[in-house]
């Protein structure tokens, strides 16, 4: 008989010191995957950034060592080296006690990022090793910690030094906590570059000692103006970078933007130099102030007739890349969530709205020719948006005959009507689509073969997108609208799975489809509903009949291992395309939820994603070739070349 679970006084545990962090790390850094791993670096860097923001130190050095430990060095004031009133060295208190720090009042930092009083101690808790070195008052001090923040000895003065003041922290993430402890250089690089854009004039030095070695220096005297230019590299711009700054209600506000000939908006926002990926009140204020300025200008100039339909704020922002940076005093700072993805400060909305409205109104009056062209551009965007709304309404309820015409002979639907369980496979080619139809679980899996050419939506207007048969069919099938009218909650499917051949043509189709989802159904990606299927490259078989042994391999490395296990006398099949697999093989390897491998598509960094889409799908051939040469290797097989990322 099973022992009954008891809940009494002895069930209550008290976690001391940093135990709580190690027990529930996700509460402090979001996750224990690569995102949480990166957060450790960001927390230490943000402390150095706060010093620079306060006016102390003009350089921050970050080094990734060969063993994936990380060193962050700044040239600020250095942590206090005396004894704390608790009886421990102040440095030890900062690095081992949660909610201990110098950012809770304006005395030391008027504005700051990081997890106040939590960041550095959390990093220590989740590291197998940490060492701190502080130079202050002409002396150097050091202390080490192991196994989750346990001090090794105590703080020591190691002697006098002529080194500049500052703090150096080295830490090694604990392998028993994180699913991976291998940093991806490009991700850290983008984050450090962002910090350099935001801290005008401060130099950031990033070094990677692993193979292949990297070394970058970032310093931008034009601040976020340079950031906007960086975002728009590779795009055809139709305005100069405009820049506003000012103080409003105790907050320091910077806003920079530039229009391109593209069709999407890209607003990147920060509060106290911390990226607010989920937006918040400051973004709402920027958008409302922007819209008010444009609407008033258009009315004063007689650009909107009495019968003219309203122009939405999103219409005015079509093709706009912008960066918003707000510095908010501690007493007003409110974030939603520990990792600070969304700003909740109510006063920020009105403050940003007021400044952006005032400055943008003046800019439009001073640049009349450009302003009139932007209003016309917004009117065209409005017309396209209304066409998108019409398509959404048709795909959801109305015009059933039209919907039936579009999907006739194309979609093989699932039997279930449950959008929380259903999956849609976008399959390259008719032959593979046929195998997928036969091999699927018809209860919840739908198949949509892609027969014609998928449009490059990076270069297309919304009106042209509706004319493309393949894209139009996808819009109707998913049933949640498109563009600004897209509502992810209306999607007919919980997963949309892109299934293509493992060759360069298949990779190109993947990029075209991902570009469409990124541009016009981005919430599908943000909610983790878009996937790429991974069909195997090889099939090994030894023997025949019921006693035969079958093994599939997805990489050349797996193939080599399987060949050793098989021994002699096996047959090898190299799949040149999905169509070469029969229905049973396709189900077992690529479609069965119990055995398949899928890649979930994520947007880790909006600015980086924007640049990648522009590079891969834009008009600049040289930029695309350069990126491919530096980031992708081509491994030749029987059927041509397979794209494999160097970093994966």
Task: Explain the meaning of each model-derived region.
Residues 94, 100-106, 286, 464-479:
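Surface-exposed acidic, glycine/proline-enriched linker/cap segments
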Residues 81-101:
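Short conserved segment of the HATPase_c
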Residues 50-51, 78-79, 504-505:
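Residues immediately C-terminal
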Residues 23-42:
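Conserved short strand/loop->alpha-helix "switch" segment adjacent to the catalytic nucleotide/phosphoryl-transfer site
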Residues 1-11, 18, 40-42, 50-52, ...:
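GHKL-family ATPase ATP-binding module
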